[in-house]
UniProtKB/Swiss-Prot annotation:
The chain crosses the membrane at residues 15-35, 44-64, 215-235, 254-274. This is Probable protein S-acyltransferase 22. It is a multi-pass membrane protein. Residues 549-571 have a biased composition (Low complexity).
Length: 596
């Protein structure tokens, strides 16, 4: 679990950001400010630039050093580094390491003492570094504590109760989000900034926004001063040769000076563009009252809708396309026929491509493969675009974020986790109307609190012969001395929750299904009973009932043999599933429903 951005390992973008700002600051005081003209101009330039760079450095250090984690994370075992057994194995490891060898006891004891001394020295060095870092960040901390408002923890606790994070194993607030990079829950999570190597949440969002504004002004000051110096260098070339030799040394000529100033100016201009784009993006976020995480969730939801719709645009997409002024009949569409028309990538970096037509198959197997590809496909990273954000509806974005929180398997409401398995559930298996009074291991509770049943269904292949079934039924018929015209009954697993309707004394063999049955009506093909069998069953009702009860033993033995060749398929739906699969309308299915 990462506590702050200065914790090892550093991100490469963090190293780049620190190096660029240090290089720009050094270049301004050495190559920019001394060559702006008169002394008064130099003092003005340094007087403006110095507070800006001080503010940027201080805010950067403070934003990266702050811990935006949820309050509950501070009490977690991961944050406190407490093992699961609650015991610290430090002393035990030292003891085991010291007493592991018997032959060279003295040498091992010496190495153990050295290891403990090295560990204590490292701890002292780390404590000194942390105290030095706190001393450097104390002015920024004082400024930020004065500017920050009151705590809103009581307000969050009153909103829909508390939530539980299964990864942090603590209770968190409603709008907290678990960051996979930092491996902790962040209070009012906005995004994970790779340039800071830290998460941005409620605790450091204001500092992050202030850092953005200060950095933009600093970069504008940098490249505007650089352009001014380059113009003066072209106009006063002879004077600049003398000034360069006087202030930088005789070995430094005009050409290297122009190269250094030009490179730093271009670098500052290039850094200003994405930073200004990010600034306007967060201005729109604040205006709409949403976060960066909500924006990302909404765009991914739109991508899924486009893929599921087969190229049809959602209302929000159509509205965006109408604002951009590019229609589907434009010349851009000739190069991207299967894609939704978007502005150039300079203004809108995300393109919402639909599924290509060749990937979609008419057959049911093709549809299944396309769905599996969509499920297995990892979500693409969403790029920041103020143009897209300006055309999004804030209410729809909030709804998408709320649905994402409801579907989350990591952070769930406390009430949802403590919801017991109560209630009655009808069990339907060929006409049985029994009810289960206790939950099984195949039952669960979905997000809405309703019960859900996962049934196991056995499907007979079409090429399976009916001779074993006929032999079992013929043997049972010979034992009961009934008419030989009885057709073999459909084999069924004996369930403890079935009623005796199927084994009643009546001669008619009824096969019924309740609305909750996982077998569809068009897939059920029970064996018909002849008229002779019906008459014989009516005359010998009692004897047939006794015979059917005795028949169950033979059926169970035969079923155990046949189940070894039967492919199992589980239904994870809410009670309804296409039992025939892809070949349901080609081969008559003989299904055996087994419920637990």
């Amino acid at each position: 679990m990462r506590k702050h951005g200065w914790q090892l390992p550093y991100h490469p973008l963090q190293v780049v950001a620190v190096a660029v700002f240090l290089a720009l600051g050094f270049a301004f005081y050495v190559f920019f400010a001394p060559f702006v003209g008169k002394k008064i101009h130099q003092y003005i330039a340094m007087g403006i630039y110095t507070p800006l760079i001080t503010c940027v450095v201080g805010l950067y250090i403070w934003c990266a050093a702050s811990d935006p984690a949820d309050r509950g994370v501070f009490r977690s075992k991961k944050y406190l580094k407490i093992p699961e057994n609650g015991k610290f194995p430090l002393a035990k490891d030292i003891k085991d390491g010291c007493g592991s060898a018997t032959g060279g006891a003295k040498s091992h004891d010496g190495t153990c003492v050295e290891d403990t001394e090295n560990g204590s020295n490292k701890k002292l060095e780390s404590s000194e570094r942390s105290s030095l870092l706190r001393l450097l960040c104390s002015p920024c901390a004082l400024l930020c504590s004065c500017c920050s408002g009151k705590d809103e923890s009581s307000e969050q606790m009153s909103e829909d109760g508390m939530f539980y994070c299964s990864l942090c194993e603590v209770e968190v607030f409603k709008y907290s989000k678990h960051c996979r990079v930092c491996d902790k829950c962040v209070d009012r999570f906005d995004h994970h900034c790779r340039w800071l190597n830290n998460c941005i949440g409620k605790r450091n969002y204001r500092k992050f926004f202030s850092l953005m504004v200060s950095a933009i002004f600093l970069l504008i000051m940098q490249w505007s001063t650089g352009i001014f110096v380059l113009v003066l260098c072209l106009l006063r070339r002879n004077q600049f040769n003398a000034d360069i030799a006087l202030k930088l040394g005789s070995s430094f000529s005009l050409i290297p000076f122009v190269i250094v100033v030009g490179v730093c100016t271009v670098l500052a201009m290039l850094a200003t563009l994405p930073l200004a784009q990010l600034f306007f993006f967060h201005i729109l976020l604040i205006k709409k009252g949403i976060s960066t995480y909500d924006y990302i969730v909404a765009l991914r939801e739109q991508e899924q809708e486009l893929e599921a719709g087969g190229g049809q645009q959602s209302p929000q997409m159509s509205m965006i396309s109408s604002f951009t002024g590019l229609s589907s009949a434009s010349s851009f569409n000739t190069f991207h026929r299967g894609a939704w028309c978007t502005p150039p990538r300079l203004f809108l970096e995300d393109q919402f491509d639909v599924v290509p037509p060749e990937n979609a198959s008419v057959s049911s197997y093709g549809k299944k493969s396309v769905v599996e590809e969509r499920v297995k496909k990892k979500p693409q990273p969403v790029k920041i675009s103020p143009w897209t954000l300006a055309r999004l509806n804030a209410e729809e974005v909030s709804k998408a974020a709320a649905e994402a929180r409801k579907k989350s398997k990591i952070i769930q409401p406390v009430a949802r986790r403590e919801n017991p398995f109560v209630g009655l559930e009808a069990s339907s298996s060929f006409g049985s109307s029994g009810r289960r009074m206790f939950p099984t291991k195949y039952e669960g509770v979905n997000n809405n609190g309703k019960q859900r049943r996962q049934s196991k269904r056995i499907r007979l292949p079409a090429e399976l012969p009916l001779e074993p079934l006929m032999n079992v039924q013929t043997k049972a018929a010979m034992e009961t001395s009934t008419s030989s015209g009885l057709a073999p009954l459909q084999l069924e697993a004996r369930s403890a929750f079935q009623t005796s309707r199927a084994m009643s004394g009546s001669g008619n063999v009824m096969v019924t299904s309740s609305p909750e049955s996982s077998l569809d009506s068009h897939d059920i093909h029970p064996f018909r009973v002849s008229s002779e069998a019906e008459d014989a069953a009516q005359l010998n009702g009692f004897s047939s009932a006794v015979g059917l009860m005795g028949q169950q033993r033979g059926q169970q033995q035969q079923q155990q043999l046949s189940m070894m060749m039967m492919p199992l398929s589980r239904s994870t739906s809410d009670g309804y599933d296409a039992s025939g699969g892809e070949d349901s309308d080609q081969v008559p299915s003989r299904n055996i429903h087994k419920s637990r």
